[in-house]
Amino acid sequence: MENFPIINLEKLNGSERDATMEMIKDACENWGFFELVNHGIPHEVMDTVEKLTKGHYKKCMEQRFKELVASKGLEAVQAEVTDLDWESTFFLRHLPVSNISEVPDLDDEYREVMRDFAKRLEKLAEELLDLLCENLGLEKGYLKKAFYGSKGPNFGTKVSNYPPCPKPDLIKGLRAHTDAGGIILLFQDDKVSGLQLLKDGQWIDVPPMRHSIVVNLGDQLEVITNGKYKSVLHRVIAQTDGTRMSLASFYNPGSDAVIYPAPTLVEKEADQECKQVYPKFVFDDYMKLYAGLKFQAKEPRFEAMKAREADVKSDPIATA
């Protein structure tokens, strides 16, 4: 079996740059996922985020989750549960306006650490988007501009904990789905596994690795690249032992950003018989549709957007 792609970003600064860019290209085209090491976020920052996230779960969320499980009788289920996930979560919004001050139960140190971590992740996400531009033959900044809308991108972090589950064969930690947005940066537990992606009909484990950042591509990048890069189904398998920590940070288009295939990429494929044309739509409209269809196939979402394409009035962005 092929090895899960692990990319050392430091190698972009030396003689191995071309080979590293090729690895990123291959990961985007054939996996939709890759794992970054030497990504520039200090290990001590990540260690502090992990310590505070796990402490916050123990102090503020663990008991709440146990009460939820008891109230729904989940420990005694006999058949597969298809309408909920075995996870305890909260969401931090960073852009365009942060909600970190308003989220209840966070202590001041945790708020400050997460603000700093978010800034570092935002910078890394934008660096990655430019690397994708380079590999795609798009001008530098194209993807950031495509995501911008009138108020800049949406950026936020879903903080999740996946506690031990008595019936992991019947309840998923998180059901299979593709991500709706742009580019996703995941800081995951390095001891408790569970994340899997679907490749060539097989579920493949995403290996836990200390101080790494897992990257995956969302539906919007599939549209903008005209299918050259694809979002990939992934899920979290609940475990009988250990609580898995996951901080998934979503760098998404602004709500009013108009998303459509980059013209230069459509032109490059004009000679191909199987040219697939993706729709043009406002990102917020896609998200409203996704909210009810997250755990279903993405293709009907694209078709639904295509049916409403005539309503999209906004002009294309001025690059390409």
Swiss-Prot record:
EC number(s) recorded for this UniProt protein: 1.14.17.4
Catalytic activity: 1-aminocyclopropane-1-carboxylate + L-ascorbate + O2 = ethene + L-dehydroascorbate + hydrogen cyanide + CO2 + 2 H2O
GO biological process per UniProt: coumarin biosynthetic process; ethylene biosynthetic process; response to molecule of fungal origin
Keywords: Ethylene biosynthesis, Iron, Metal-binding, Oxidoreductase, Vitamin C
Required cofactor names: Fe cation
Cysteine pairs bridged by disulfides in the record: none
Keyword set includes rRNA processing: no
Pathway named in the protein's UniProt entry: Alkene biosynthesis; ethylene biosynthesis via S-adenosyl-L-methionine; ethylene from S-adenosyl-L-methionine: step 2/2
PROSITE patterns: FE2OG_OXY
The protein's name in its UniProt record: 1-aminocyclopropane-1-carboxylate oxidase 3
Lineage: Eukaryota, Viridiplantae, Streptophyta, Embryophyta, Tracheophyta
